[in-house]
């Protein structure tokens, strides 16, 4: 892993700070509901940017979300902004009583991976904690149809040690949520890359 990060950092001569991603190919059958791999974790060193977080909530929960640093908080009026084409955010959180308002936005939010979900922890009554976690660098992922999971793990400007810590934490977390029904090799391959670089394989 250390070698892979050092190889990747040799490509860093671009004028902007490239985002570093991890791609893991899994030995799962994505058509089976009991083999879906999804989750979220706060990386030890963040991801190098403050994520823009919006929250669907009312009353006290709305106040808590605002105090925690949410970029936008609301209900019907927030839904209308999204329906009108506003999607300038990275994370969408909702309190459970707001799902009646959020549900119809699924066609807009779902394809972008922004739909709040109880399994991902983005449908919650503890909105303040979740807002703080995402602003601190929490990443969320779900396997795609090709049995891959992808996530941002930092920036090229990070020290190699910090990238290694983030990538190691992500791999360990993915290993820890292996579905019980998966037989054979679970992690088939791991690669890291940045915005403008080739992929570098990591030994699984």
Residue ranges and their predicted role:
Residues 4, 65, 110, 192:
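Residue-level signature of catalytic and energy-coupling elements of molecular machines
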């Amino acid at each position: 892993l250390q070698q892979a990060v050092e190889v990747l950092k040799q490509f860093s001569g671009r004028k902007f700070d490239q985002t570093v991603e991890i791609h893991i190919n899994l030995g799962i059958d994505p058509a089976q509901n009991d083999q879906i791999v999804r989750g979220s974790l706060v990386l030890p060193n963040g991801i190098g940017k403050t994520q823009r977080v919006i929250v669907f909530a009312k009353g006290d929960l709305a106040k808590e979300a605002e105090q925690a640093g949410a970029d936008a908080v609301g209900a019907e009026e927030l839904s209308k902004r999204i329906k009108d084409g506003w999607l300038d955010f990275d994370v969408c959180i909702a309190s459970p009583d707001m799902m009646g308002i959020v549900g119809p936005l699924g066609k807009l939010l779902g394809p972008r991976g922004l739909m709040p979900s109880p399994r991902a922890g983005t449908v919650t009554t503890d909105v303040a904690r979740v807002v703080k976690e995402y602003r601190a660098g929490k990443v969320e992922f779900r396997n795609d149809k090709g049995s891959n999971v992808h996530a941002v793990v930092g920036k090229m400007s990070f020290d190699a040690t910090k990238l290694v810590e983030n990538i190691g934490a992500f791999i360990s977390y993915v290993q820890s949520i292996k579905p019980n029904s998966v037989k054979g090799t679970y992690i088939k391959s791991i690669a890291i890359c940045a915005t403008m670089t080739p992929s570098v394989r990591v030994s699984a």
